[in-house]
């Protein structure tokens, strides 16, 4: 798989043929931030307060909306309003993994109304390519009111110890993304996936975005198997956007932590594109 990670976000925005990918790169460039904060909070009040406080420093807010105990229309309204106020995208970390017909209903409808407010969602290839086809059908349909404003990330790898998201699974994730590139804009992975060869050849316009989870300046991991890497290490390994949760929101000063991750992530990104231009 090819990578355009040595190009600037501005260059990639100009070249990308997917409108939501272009918007993401434009946000990153404008805010000088490649930070995705994983807001794993359990009430609407906590979630919206964090989004409002950290919004100026992030490119994307990642949610696990099914852990919000009092999810309601005010949750949706608040997320959408703050996304516009602070110019960030919303990524619902739903990890869709079911038959296509069910996934379509979970995404576009149901109690969580995900397609209404989440710019990005993700899915696992575990259920087969049909799940990706189903989501792509919904997201690219002319009847879909948010066409061009939504995108899908494939869960190609995970940061947990002992994960089975490796090898053939990762390759299948890439193959599916290539088949449905009108809706799939990138991957959740621990590194650039350029070493993995697929049956589908790369196109000139191919530019999948890499989101890396488990980014934490305290690299010890946790007792439940999560493994961490620093912002600089993640960018060096090919991340375009770095996802951090507890490393930011669980600190004594989340705003200061968000600024720190923003600065470190951006500095690592600038080093990467500078090295491209100087030939190092």
Swiss-Prot record:
InterPro entries: Aldolase_TIM, OMPdecase, OMPdecase_AS, OMPdeCOase_dom, RibuloseP-bd_barrel. It holds the Pfam family OMPdecase. GO terms for molecular function: orotate phosphoribosyltransferase activity; orotidine-5'-phosphate decarboxylase activity. GO terms for biological process: 'de novo' pyrimidine nucleobase biosynthetic process; 'de novo' UMP biosynthetic process. SUPFAM superfamilies: Ribulose-phoshate binding barrel. PROSITE patterns: OMPDECASE. It comes from the Eukaryota. Pathway: Pyrimidine metabolism; UMP biosynthesis via de novo pathway; UMP from orotate: step 2/2. It catalyses: orotidine 5'-phosphate + H(+) = UMP + CO2. Substrate binds at residues 40, 62-64, 93-102, 228, 246. It is an enzyme of class 4 (lyase). Transmembrane segments: none annotated. Its EC number is 4.1.1.23. The keyword Lyase applies. CDD domains: OMP_decarboxylase_like (cd04725). Keywords: Decarboxylase, Lyase, Pyrimidine biosynthesis. The keyword Lyase applies. The active site is at residue 95. Belongs to the OMP decarboxylase family. NCBIfam families: pyrF. This is Orotidine 5'-phosphate decarboxylase. It comes from Solorina crocea. The gene is PYRG.
């Amino acid at each position: 798989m090819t990578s355009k990670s040595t190009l600037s976000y501005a260059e990639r925005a100009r070249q990308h043929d997917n409108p939501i990918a272009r918007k993401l790169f434009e946000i990153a460039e404008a805010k000088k931030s490649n930070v995705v904060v994983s807001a794993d909070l359990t009430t609407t009040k906590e979630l919206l307060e964090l989004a409002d406080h950290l919004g100026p420093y992030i490119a994307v807010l990642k949610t696990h909306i099914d852990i919000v105990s009092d999810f309601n229309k005010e949750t949706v309204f608040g997320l959408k309003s703050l996304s516009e106020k602070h110019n960030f995208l919303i990524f619902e970390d739903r990890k869709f993994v079911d038959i296509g017909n069910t996934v379509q209903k979970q995404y576009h409808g149901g109690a969580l109304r995900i397609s209404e407010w989440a710019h990005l969602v993700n899915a696992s290839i575990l259920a087969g390519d049909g799940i990706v086809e189903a989501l792509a059908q919904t997201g690219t349909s002319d009847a879909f009111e948010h066409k061009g404003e939504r995108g899908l990330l494939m869960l190609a790898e995970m940061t947990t110890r002992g994960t089975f998201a490796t090898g053939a699974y990762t390759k299948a994730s890439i193959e599916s993304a290539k088949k449905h590139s009108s809706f799939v804009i990138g991957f959740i992975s621990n590194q650039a996936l350029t070493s993995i060869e697929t049956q589908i050849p790369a196109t000139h316009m191919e530019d999948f975005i890499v989101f890396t989870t488990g980014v934490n300046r305290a690299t010890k991991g946790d007792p439940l198997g999560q493994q961490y890497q620093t912002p600089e290490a993640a960018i060096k390994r090919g991340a375009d956007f770095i996802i951090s949760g507890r490393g930011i929101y669980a600190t004594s000063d989340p705003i200061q932590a968000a600024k720190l991750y923003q600065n470190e992530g951006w500095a690592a990104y600038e080093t990467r594109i500078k090295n491209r231009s100087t030939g190092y």
